[in-house]
Amino acid sequence: MSELKTGHAGHNPWASVANSGPISILSYCGSSILMTVTNKFVVNLKDFNMNFVMLFVQSLVCTITLIILRILGYAKFRSLNKTDAKNWFPISFLLVLMIYTSSKALQYLAVPIYTIFKNLTIILIAYGEVLFFGGSVTSMELSSFLLMVLSSVVATWGDQQAVAAKAASLAEGAAGAVASFNPGYFWMFTNCITSALFVLIMRKRIKLTNFKDFDTMFYNNVLALPILLLFSFCVEDWSSVNLTNNFSNDSLTAMIISGVASVGISYCSGWCVRVTSSTTYSMVGALNKLPIALSGLIFFDAPRNFLSILSIFIGFLSGIIYAVAKQKKQQAQPLRK
């Protein structure tokens, strides 16, 4: 069992908060926005090329934070044991693949392009729920998915306009380099698949193992540590020169901040999946790209044009339609649960 220490055992005011769908969604939104922005900052630092190390720091911070909370009596979760570790290891492995491919995609792609494939993940997860959990997708929900994809396509057109304008201002050789294949598409395609598998399989394993939020957070991160370190030693450059370039004061500070942000996203992602559904979790993740797009205008010099702004409005419209569709579905099935 895992829980947050809340005081007396009688009526627990925190119980309603811990099982609140809207609060879990808002918490997940805030933490995931902070996580994405800090990750984008880290991977865009000059000469930074040790993504696995960055992700290792994040998981290490999460693990240490949980252990401290447990010592202080504010958190309870299952101790690491062989049976649970064996059952949960595939989830942690998928988590490593998901967060690594996400960091590589953010490194090479603009946020609007990144959003397109995240929206495709929503559809994969929605129909994955149909296959694995007996769920259903209404025509109204499908309409919201299509609108979300449309908002991403419109954002991409805006991004392409900006790229074309930039290429036109460059010399012919540089323009050719701009037009060359972007490896970010490969990373995004891989991230799309691993994200869908992670969310669907984690939800199933949570039901089978009866993991609570802190259990999920602890096992996700502590099992990811050796995987991340092994991958880093295998594929990343650990020479003294490269370590010096990667571990500057700016990069270390940014990695610590991103590690703190990962504490929130690690807890809130499991919390959101438990009290809502994996489709709602993924849709909220896609809606996060809207404020992230706005932060990109401020921090990351994202394209500023009519199409970029239009995509934001279409995205919010799709979110409203999705919320109404979910409400109608619940009203049509009042006796379930």
From Swiss-Prot:
GO function term, MF aspect, one: GDP-mannose transmembrane transporter activity
Top-level taxon: Eukaryota
Membrane topology: Multi-pass membrane protein
Mutagenesis or variant effect for A286V: In VIG4-1; increases drug sensitivity and decreases protein glycolysis
Compartments (UniProt record): Golgi apparatus membrane; Cytoplasmic vesicle membrane; Endoplasmic reticulum membrane
Keywords, ordered alphabetically: Cytoplasmic vesicle, Endoplasmic reticulum, Glycoprotein, Golgi apparatus, Membrane, Sugar transport, Transmembrane, Transmembrane helix, Transport
Documented effect of changing S282A: Decreases transport activity and GDP-mannose-binding
Keyword Glycoprotein: yes
Residues modified by glycosylation: N119, N242, N246, N249
Stretches the record annotates as RET2-binding: 326-337
Effect of L287A: Decreases transport activity and GDP-mannose-binding
GO BP annotation list: GDP-mannose transmembrane transport
Lumenal side: 38-51, 114-119, 166-180, 237-252, 301-304
GO cellular component term, pick one: endoplasmic reticulum membrane
Membrane topology, Cytoplasmic segments: 1-16, 73-92, 141-144, 202-215, 274-279, 326-337
Annotated TM spans: 17-37, 52-72, 93-113, 120-140, 145-165, 181-201, 216-236, 253-273, 280-300, 305-325
InterPro entries xref list: SCL35B1-4/HUT1, TPT_transporter
Effect caused by changing S278C: In VIG4-2; increases drug sensitivity and decreases protein glycolysis
Ligand binding (GDP-alpha-D-mannose): T279, T280, Y281, S282, M283, V284, G285, A286, L287, N288, K289, L290, P291
Functional note: Involved in the import of GDP-mannose from the cytoplasm into the Golgi lumen. Defective copy causes severe glycosylation defect and abnormal retention of soluble endoplasmic reticulum proteins. Involved in vanadate sensitivity.
Family membership: Belongs to the TPT transporter family. SLC35D subfamily.
PANTHER family with a match to the protein in the record: SOLUTE CARRIER FAMILY 35
Note: Present with 31900 molecules/cell in log phase SD medium.
Subunit structure: Homooligomer.
Protein name, UniProt field: GDP-mannose transporter 1
Annotated organism of origin: Saccharomyces cerevisiae (strain ATCC 204508 / S288c) (Baker's yeast)
High-level lineage: Eukaryota, Fungi, Dikarya, Ascomycota, Saccharomycotina
Gene: VRG4
